[in-house]
């Protein structure tokens, strides 16, 4: 599956930059010689954030500054309404750049990425996704990044209200929304910059095998059950999440694969990778909450046998008896085993439900706070009513 990646705001642009980086690796001689990205764009109201990107081309068709006359290139200050207004004004320019990009006709979907907590990304992603769905004639998916826990603690937290507004809007206009929770991958002892870098890399890495599997051209790496853009499209709807789990075979597995002790190791390793994939989901949900599940098994051909696939299928059926389950394989060499797991049409997401509840409470508190501030200002004005001014 080939995509066009569009990042909005600082967070979204950084993730789009990582998609560009992993595509460069994928195309290389030392990678898989597969192209999974036709192009990538970074859209922001802050030109300084755009200058920090490493991989997306530096021309103005790929790094797009919007709202320069309103913000002077310094962002919208977390005001998502301002971000939405600027995005609506800039839609013709952005969409023309996307449609005129190299090999756009070859892409299977468009992925729009933003943080829910910011201003430009949170406000801009809804209008852009809606406009793209009307124009491009391809599935338009969204990635929305949830804020860190510390951003939600303040009684006047813009992060909570912005995220709730963003999620509600995007869920109504996108074909599917991947929700990434920063809290799932954050490490307290590591710098904030490193935390953000790890989260971005992990998110993009989760999609790597999934996108490569349907574009593989070498016969020995083509699976018996191939997952392509059509399968992904049918598997995705509404709120979704993705995770990846890994296991490693013994060094001498290739020479011992006929040994009786090795007969069950493959299935055991795959089940272990599946458990890790569930634990590594970008959102804290269980498989039982999904109505659609897609599992991609990546391993040497001798490991992906009928017994192993049956074991994985039974394991998923037990965890999610009501879900429609698709299982595909992607033969790889070397000793690495991995499983990419996509859960979609999630019926219960505690994290987002809590954000909606907090946002409602904060909006009510904000109204009372505004009234209190207005009352205080009026009282001060009354106190100084008899004092002259020198203007």
Model-derived regions, located:
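Tubulin/FtsZ superfamily GTPase core signature
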Residues: 1-391
């Amino acid at each position: 599956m080939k995509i066009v990646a569009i990042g909005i705001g600082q967070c979204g642009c950084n993730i789009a930059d990582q998609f560009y980086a992993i595509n460069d690796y994928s195309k290389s001689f030392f990678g898989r010689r597969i192209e999974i990205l036709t192009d990538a764009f970074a859209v922001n109201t802050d030109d300084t954030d755009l200058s920090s990107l490493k991989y997306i081309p530096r021309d103005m068709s790929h790094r797009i500054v919007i709202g320069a006359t309103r913000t002077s290139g310094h962002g919208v200050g977390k005001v998502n309404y301002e971000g939405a207004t600027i995005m609506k004004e800039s839609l013709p320019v952005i969409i023309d750049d996307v449609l005129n990009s190299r090999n756009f006709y070859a892409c299977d979907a468009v992925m729009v990425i933003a943080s829910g907590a910011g201003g430009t990304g949170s406000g801009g992603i809804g209008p852009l996704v809606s406009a793209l769905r009307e124009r491009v004639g391809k599935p338009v998916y969204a990635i929305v990044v949830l804020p860190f826990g510390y951003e939600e603690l303040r009684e006047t937290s813009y992060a909570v209200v912005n995220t709730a507004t963003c999620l509600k809007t995007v869920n109504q206009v996108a074909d599917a929304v991947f929700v990434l929770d920063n809290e799932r991958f954050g490490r307290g002892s590591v710098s904030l910059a490193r935390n953000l870098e790890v989260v971005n890399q992990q998110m993009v890495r989760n999609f790597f095998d999934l996108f490569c599997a349907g574009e593989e051209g070498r016969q020995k790496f083509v699976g018996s059950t191939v997952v392509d853009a059509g399968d992904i499209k049918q598997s995705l709807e509404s709120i979704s999440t993705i995770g990846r789990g890994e296991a490693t075979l013994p060094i001498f597995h290739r020479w011992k694969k006929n040994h009786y002790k090795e007969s069950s190791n493959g299935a055991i390793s795959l089940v272990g990778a599946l458990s890790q994939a569930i634990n590594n989901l970008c959102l804290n949900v269980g498989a039982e909450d999904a109505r659609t599940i897609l599992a991609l098994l990546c391993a040497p051909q001798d490991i992906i046998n009928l017994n192993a696939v049956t074991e994985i299928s039974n394991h998923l059926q037990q965890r999610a008896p009501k879900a429609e389950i698709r299982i595909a394989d992607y033969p790889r060499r070397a000793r690495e085993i991995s499983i990419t797991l996509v859960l979609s049409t999630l019926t219960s997401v505690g994290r987002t439900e809590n954000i909606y509840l907090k946002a409602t409470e904060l909006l009510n508190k904000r109204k009372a706070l505004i009234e209190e501030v207005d009352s205080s200002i009026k009282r001060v004005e009354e106190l100084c009513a008899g004092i002259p001014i020198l203007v």
